[in-house]
Amino acid sequence: MSDSGASRLRRQLESGGFEARLYVKQLSQQSDGDRDLQEHRQRVQALAEETAQNLKRNVYQNYRQFIETAREISYLESEMYQLSHLLTEQKSSLESIPLALLPAAAAGASTGEDTAGAGPRERGAAQAGFLPGPAGVPREGPGTGEEGKQRTLTTLLEKVEGCRDLLETPGQYLVYNGDLVEYEADHMAQLQRVHGFLMNDCLLVATWLPQRRGMYRYNALYPLDRLAVVNVKDNPPMKDMFKLLMFPESRIFQAENAKIKREWLEVLEETKRALSDKRRREQEEAAALRAPPPVTSKGSNPFEDEAEEELATPEAEEEKVDLSMEWIQELPEDLDVCIAQRDFEGAVDLLDKLNHYLEDKPSPPSVKELRAKVDERVRQLTEVLVFELSPDRSLRGGPKATRRAVSQLIRLGQCTKACELFLRNRAAAVHTAIRQLRIEGATLLYIHKLCHVFFTSLLETAREFETDFAGTDSGCYSAFVVWARSAMGMFVDAFSKQVFDSKESLSTAAECVKVAKEHCQQLGEIGLDLTFIIHALLVKDIQGALLSYKEIIIEATKHRNSEEMWRRMNLMTPEALGKLKEEMRSCGVSNFEQYTGDDCWVNLSYTVVAFTKQTMGFLEEALKLYFPELHMVLLESLVEVILVAVQHVDYSLRCEQDPEKKTFIRQNASFLYDTVLPVVERRFEEGVGKPAKQLQDLRNASRLLRVNPESTTSVV
């Protein structure tokens, strides 16, 4: 597909006024045949694949947004965890108050003022100058003096190789640190032992140096504002793990136990929140320096009172919805009764009455509460109606048995669901009806039963669909056409299995296809033409049957040719001669009388007569199966069959030395060229509707005028 053609097609499909139906109609009118439509289909498919690739690329580009979403989820999870932890601590604190002595409480009042905003564990840690970390590792807090902070940083710089230049930042201090084990994210294989150092604005990950006890090497440094922490649920033996997300990578670490893991999660979230609050305060202070002039006071704005009155007016009106009527108060219970008694129409009538009453009214809390109760009943009613249309229910009632449930679903505003369930129910019914047909007797008898059952069911379904969904969205009709195409595929599967897979004769197959076409044309009564679908589904099987029968004729003709003695036929009795004349007249050979005499002799070879009957029979049966997609297959098969007989006559004429037999062969050749071929050509044109140039060329290229007496080979 060229770039210009692709861009032109893309612009056409992306235009605001694009209409698919008009586009397909114009395309069908402008195309020369099936090949053009196939090429256009390939172009549309290529454009669809290109669009899919662009969509994948856009999804990958939006991966950062996914990371941000995961980060916010982890924030929420951590906050919920901390809230639960704080509530537990507050509960234990309140329970311990009655047990404390009043003098002790008075003595502790002076020291409790500075730590009143923190939990018990944080208050004790603040008094000691540090927060306890895992396994005795100190967790420094912002309350530690400048000297302690500097001392902690100095110790850190001495233990970690390669981080001195990275951590010399004013105001930076150590908050928490501890040993961790890193795991591979995909296969959960252990990678290495690391040590984590959490600062007030970043997280440092360092690897162990096995040959140097207590020393580490710098591995990675992550700013806290770009870091998301996710708790990993325990899945033994993998437990006590948490994940760090840093676009575009993630790392999984395992703590020594559940307590240390909890400490890591808490302190990471606390530090991230503190950093966020600090930067927000800095932004607010910076914004305050360039704040706009003060807003006009309330007393100097004469319009503010009027605006407040206007805003208050709807609120007052919202409270005036009257829900005290008895039928509204009892509506939820009445809906329950209707659903229990399977009074679907009554339930929907009540809902319509309520919607009509509340149509133009506001939605104060009382109305919202009523709506919530009613919506729950609507959900229950929908579930019951869906069950009524499920294929598991009895299918004996036919399409009309579904009308009640379908109509109520449409009234509830669920037309699409009603359409889907109705068609699914009818598909199950059609499948069951086809499966219950007994295969017995002749194939044609079974096909008559199959066509009657299937097309009658399809016609009833179409009429019921038109009744139920009249006036609804046109998309439902598109869904019905798709369903009919699928149902036709189910029918063709059963049809082909019995007709073509069982190797029936071509005449039987032709009669069966004729019966199916006649039934399919009955759907035209309701404006539904599925003939092209049945053609498309049967073309492969019919083509195979034609080619198979062609090979049978060719083999039979070659076998007769091998035994050819070039003698006149002797039918022995006048009755046999009369029967042959009748057969030739039915084949379209009207001048057969000139090749017969007063006695029972026929001045033609048995091989030529048998070939004529077999070829004309093949043509008649093939024309019953004909539709445009099979034109070239039928034409090429006819030409190939005729060439076998013509070449045999030409070869025999060259090789025969007896003058009397040579004259007889010429008479048979004249019968083939002057009688049989024109009949084949005329009958083909009558059945197809247009002449066949290949047959004309075959007849016009008379072999009798090009015979080389010295040649002993046939001209192909």
Swiss-Prot record:
Pfam families, per database record: Exo84_C, VPS51_Exo84_N
Residue numbers of Phosphothreonine PTMs: T313
Region feature Disordered, mapped onto this chain: 110-149, 275-319
GO terms of biological process kind: endosome organization; exocytosis; extracellular matrix disassembly; Golgi to plasma membrane transport; protein localization; protein transport
Domain PH: 173-273
Record keyword Transport present: yes
Similarity comment text for this entry: Belongs to the EXO84 family.
Effect of A228W: Strongly reduces interaction with RALA
Cellular compartment(s): Cytoplasm; Cytoplasm, Perinuclear region; Cell projection, Growth cone; Cell projection
Keyword Cytoplasm: yes
Keyword annotations of the record: Cell projection, Cytoplasm, Exocytosis, Phosphoprotein, Protein transport, Transport
Superkingdom of origin: Eukaryota
Main location per the UniProt record: cytoplasm
Natural source organism: Rattus norvegicus
Residues where Phosphoserine is found: S15
Stretches with biased composition (Basic and acidic residues): 275-284
Gene3D superfamilies: Exo84p, C-terminal helical domain (1.20.58.1220), Exo84p, N-terminal helical domain (1.20.58.1210), Pleckstrin-homology domain (PH domain)/Phosphotyrosine-binding domain (PTB) (2.30.29.30)
GO cellular component terms listed in the entry, alphabetical order: cell leading edge; exocyst; growth cone; late endosome; perinuclear region of cytoplasm
Function of the molecule: Component of the exocyst complex involved in the docking of exocytic vesicles with fusion sites on the plasma membrane.
Record field: compositional bias (Acidic residues): 303-319
Self-association and partners: The exocyst complex is composed of EXOC1, EXOC2, EXOC3, EXOC4, EXOC5, EXOC6, EXOC7 and EXOC8. Interacts (via PH domain) with GTP-bound RALA and RALB. Interacts with SH3BP1; required for the localization of both SH3BP1 and the exocyst to the leading edge of migrating cells.
Segments forming a coiled coil: none
Protein name: Exocyst complex component 8
